[in-house]
């Protein structure tokens, strides 16, 4: 049950003006709170970006992308285009969110125990290695070889959005495997970015960045749970990373890994003290009036708020703070300013014969499917791990198809792989969009229509 919602307020103390505003905002709030709202927004903005890049708006669109934005404090300055501010600065918050999800899964989620983690880890490894090899088979030499990391990633937001549309066609445990697989994929992508897509290293800023990381670890070890301290030092680490040659977004992941995941109070302690506070609140003579009329009531609420914060882990609080701005502002901005690719029909024949197109498309659509499904089958055959009892082999095939939705992370890697190579970058982006759409359509249709009657097969093993 949900508490403290706008709807409950409307039934009691809402003024006529509040009711009118609430009614106007209701569709917007429902969209923001829907599980697939972010995915719908990303699809819409992808279309908008493509329209901008292929109409008379193209000149304006590119001018905005290349607009310089200077941040200066004394002699220190960072001067980048809006495009790079989004990709190197704002996307650091996306990678911070990714890092928080990785740490959560490794601590208490599906990756917390080796027994539960084996299947998604092997599936993710298969889903990274096979697409990279397929890409390399088409691009074994020349300047396009650097794009091998593009088809390795899975866009978790889009994959989960497709599963939500299917409502019950996939077992919950297999859905959890896909989520864990995508998180391991993200971890792999971060490692690839940090190691293989790094410019010439500047050692002084890099050492300073890792000193910041060491300070964050010491804060964690010392029981410091103030989020502002981690954000401040993490921001400083981002600046050093930016000048070090390592991609600055790595600072987001490192900050996440150093964020504490232990609370001050246990649930039992919180429950006991919160009940005492609420009893005092109810017994107070001013409890029937507005809190603004009583300092004592306000003090009780402040104590309750402090208790709530100290019962939540800093990691959970930061993840909650970041969730809406990351998925409804930062990632949409990234898509809007990175998915706009100018398509020249005159060059369509050359595009279709491009080794980049072949490597990315076959890597995402077929490489992911082959890699994920083969890894799961090998694990089950060798009894390294068991297929979830409520899952079927047909569902595993569908999950393998959905893993080919690269989108956000693939576009991000393509920007690094083909920096300064406009033609190859355009080819990669067009192919990522086409391949992700193909993988999503195949996965959805397979799980919707082919596995529709497969519920009775629940419990069958992959060997069948």
UniProtKB/Swiss-Prot annotation:
Q: Where in the cell is it found?
A: Cell inner membrane
Q: Which UniProt keywords apply?
A: Antiport, Cell inner membrane, Cell membrane, Ion transport, Membrane, Sodium, Sodium transport, Transmembrane, Transmembrane helix, Transport
What cellular-component terms does GO give this entry? plasma membrane
Coarsely, its chief localization is membrane
Q: How does it sit in the membrane?
A: Multi-pass membrane protein
One Pfam family name is Na_H_antiport_1
What start-end ranges are recorded for coiled-coil regions in this protein?
none
The molecular function terms in GO held by this entry are: sodium:proton antiporter activity
| Record-annotated membrane-spanning stretches | 37-57, 82-102, 118-138, 145-165, 176-196, 200-220, 226-246, 248-268, 321-341, 360-380, 396-416, 430-450
Please cite one Gene Ontology biological process associated with this protein.
regulation of pH
Write down the HAMAP family for this protein, in alphabetical order: NhaA
What does this protein do, in the record's words? Na(+)/H(+) antiporter that extrudes sodium in exchange for external protons.
As for family, the record states: Belongs to the NhaA Na(+)/H(+) (TC 2.A.33) antiporter family.
| Protein name listed in UniProt | Na(+)/H(+) antiporter NhaA
Q: Which organism is it from?
A: Dichelobacter nodosus (strain VCS1703A)
């Amino acid at each position: 049950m949900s508490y403290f919602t706008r709807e409950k307020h409307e039934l009691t103390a809402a003024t006529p003006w509040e009711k009118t505003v609430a009614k106007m905002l209701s569709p917007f709030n429902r969209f923001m709170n829907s599980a697939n709202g972010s995915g719908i927004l990303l699809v819409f903005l992808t279309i908008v970006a493509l329209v901008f890049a292929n109409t008379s708006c193209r000149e304006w669109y590119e001018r905005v992308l290349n607009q310089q934005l200077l941040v200066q404090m004394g002699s220190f300055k960072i001067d980048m285009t809006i495009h790079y501010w989004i990709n190197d600065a704002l996307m650091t918050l996306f990678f911070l969110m990714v890092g928080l999800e990785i740490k959560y899964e490794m601590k208490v989620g599906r990756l917390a125990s080796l027994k539960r983690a084996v299947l998604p880890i092997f599936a993710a490894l298969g889903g990274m290695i096979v697409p990279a090899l397929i890409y390399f088979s088409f691009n074994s030499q020349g300047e396009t070889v650097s794009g091998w990391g593009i088809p390795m990633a899975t866009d978790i937001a889009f994959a989960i959005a497709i599963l939500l549309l299917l409502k019950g066609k996939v077992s919950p445990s297999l859905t959890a495997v896909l989520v864990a697989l995508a998180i391991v994929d993200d971890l792999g992508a971060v490692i690839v970015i940090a190691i293989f897509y790094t410019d010439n290293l500047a050692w002084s800023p890099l050492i300073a960045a890792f000193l910041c990381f060491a300070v964050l670890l010491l804060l964690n070890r010392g029981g410091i749970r103030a989020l502002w301290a981690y954000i401040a030092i993490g921001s400083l680490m981002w600046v050093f990373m930016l000048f070090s040659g390592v991609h600055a977004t790595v600072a987001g992941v490192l900050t996440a890994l150093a964020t504490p995941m232990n609370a001050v109070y246990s649930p039992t302690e919180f429950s006991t003290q919160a009940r005492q506070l609420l009893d005092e609140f109810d017994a107070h003579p001013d409890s029937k009036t507005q809190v603004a009329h009583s300092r004592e009531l306000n003090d009780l609420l402040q104590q309750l708020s402090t208790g709530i914060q100290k019962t939540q882990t800093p990691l959970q609080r930061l993840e909650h703070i970041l969730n809406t701005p990351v998925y409804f502002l930062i990632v949409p901005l990234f898509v809007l300013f990175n998915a706009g690719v100018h398509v020249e029909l005159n060059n369509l024949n050359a595009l279709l014969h491009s080794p980049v197109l072949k490597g990315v498309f076959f890597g995402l659509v077929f490489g992911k499917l082959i890699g994920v499904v083969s890894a799961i089958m090998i694990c089950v055959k060798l009894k390294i791990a068991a297929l979830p009892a409520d899952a079927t082999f047909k569902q595993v095939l569908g999950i393998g198809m959905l893993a080919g939705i690269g989108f956000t992370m693939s576009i991000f890697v393509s920007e690094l792989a083909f920096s300064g190579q406009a033609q190859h970058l355009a080819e990669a982006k067009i192919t990522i969009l086409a391949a992700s759409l193909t993988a999503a359509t195949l996965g959805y249709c397979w799980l919707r229509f082919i596995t529709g009657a497969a519920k009775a097969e629940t419990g069958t093993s992959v060997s069948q």
